Amino acid sequence: LPFVTNQPFKAKATEVVEPRNTMQQLKAKTLEMRTPQATKTAVLVIGGAEDKVHGREILRTFVARAGASKAYITIVPSASREPAIIGGRYIRLFEEMGAQKVEILDIREREQCENPEIKASLENCTGVFLTGGDQLRLCGVLADTPAMDLIRQRVRAGQLTLAGTSAGAAVMGHHMIAGGGSGETPNRSLVDMATGLGFIPEVIVDQHFHNRNRMGRLISAITAHPDRLGIGIDEDTCAVFERDGWLQVVGKGSVTIVDPTELTHTNEPHVSANEPLNVHNLRLHILSYGDRFHLYQRTVLPAVHRLPSYGDSYGDNVS
């Protein structure tokens, strides 16, 4: 399992805080949970349309995790029809955020993945950013190539922070949503599946999630693959997957978890493509900013939303 380590998760939402150090300890804990750690690699799965103008929190989190002022970021715009334009936009953004070096790997053909210069870039960079576009195009260019093997190896070794937005998010699982409909009753024809790049093989990711009414198609995908976990990510929202198995939500929207662990029945194997699916005992979580979910333990930790002000008595006015 690529994200499991022996190091325990530090933040405990139910930890008892002694009154004499209430403010100091709460502030320290919240700062630790909300401040990106420049030396701590992760996989950032972004629902698309991330903020590029105002706070840019998701992109800043990526740069911080990739090394902050020492970050060497490689942009892979292979999913896009206009890779030079899209890549150039992200170069400007990451340079403005203080990254030490930013470059584009404009890979349009599979043969390029064997280029020694591309290999050297991927061996030395600290962050890889997969842009949006068409997830089938991205997989067609990168899947089962030396370049992709190298990225996957370095991500699993904790040597590289990886981020993908929109189509770049869709490819994260082994099973990938390649297309389909939206806003309909779950049914087999609602979702088209393909093989992804398998960075987080346990999940099936859908993006632009509530913005494009994609709950039905994610449920349809999970019903066909009940050994996986469904992750639906809204626009300008990111699921940060840590190497210890926890994911944390960053951004303005929500992350929807569709968990079939306790599923007791579905008619999926027996109905035609357009017939409604029934799915019994499916578990659902809606996570927002700061909430955490453990990929393997299936446990949830709520966010610490606000510190009490200095005028509040201990325990009052905390939400």
How would you describe each model-predicted region?
Residues 4, 11-18:
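Acidic, Ala/Val/Gly-enriched low-complexity intrinsically disordered segments
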Residues 45, 103-105, 129-130, 162-165, ...:
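General beta-strand structural signal in soluble alpha/beta enzymes
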Residues 80-124, 130, 137:
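Portal/gating segments that form or line small-molecule/metal binding sites
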Residues 131, 137-215:
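Class I SAM-dependent methyltransferase SAM-binding "motif I" and its flanking Rossmann-like core
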Residues 24-69, 81-96, 101, 177-319:
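C-terminal and late-domain segments of enzyme folds
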Residues 74-78:
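Short internal beta-strands
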Residues 121-127, 136-161, 284, 289, ...:
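Mature, structured domains of secreted/extracytosolic soluble proteins
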Residues 8, 19, 25:
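Cationic, low-complexity basic patches in intrinsically disordered or flexible, solvent-exposed regions
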